[in-house]
């Protein structure tokens, strides 16, 4: 019971960060597939054409 109560806030926070990171990665790959990318990790695909 104690661990559940204690870990709940940190679980929510880490879930938020994890989801944000996953969204960022999926956006990066989506843009890379479309031939444009605003993330340096895309390397030679790094560009932000609209």
Swiss-Prot record:
> InterPro entries recorded for this chain?
Conotoxin_a-typ
Record's keyword terms, sorted: Amidation, Disulfide bond, Secreted, Signal, Toxin
Any single Gene Ontology cellular-component annotation: extracellular region
As for subcellular location, the record says:
Secreted
Tissue spec: Expressed by the venom duct.
Record's compositionally biased regions (Basic and acidic residues): 14-26
Q: Which residues form the propeptide?
A: 8-35
Q: List the disulfide bonds.
A: 37-42, 38-48
Cite the record's Polar residues compositional bias ranges.
1-13
Region annotation (Disordered) maps to: 1-26
Tell me the residues on which Cysteine amide occurs: 48
Where is this protein chiefly located?
secreted
* Signal sequence residues: 1-7
**What molecular functions are annotated in GO for this chain?**
acetylcholine receptor inhibitor activity; toxin activity
Similarity section: Belongs to the conotoxin A superfamily.
Further information: Found in injectable (milked) (IV) venom.
Q: What is known of its domains?
A: The cysteine framework is I (CC-C-C). Alpha3/5 pattern.
- For this entry, the protein name equals Alpha-conotoxin CnIG
Q: Which organism is it from?
A: Conus consors (Singed cone)
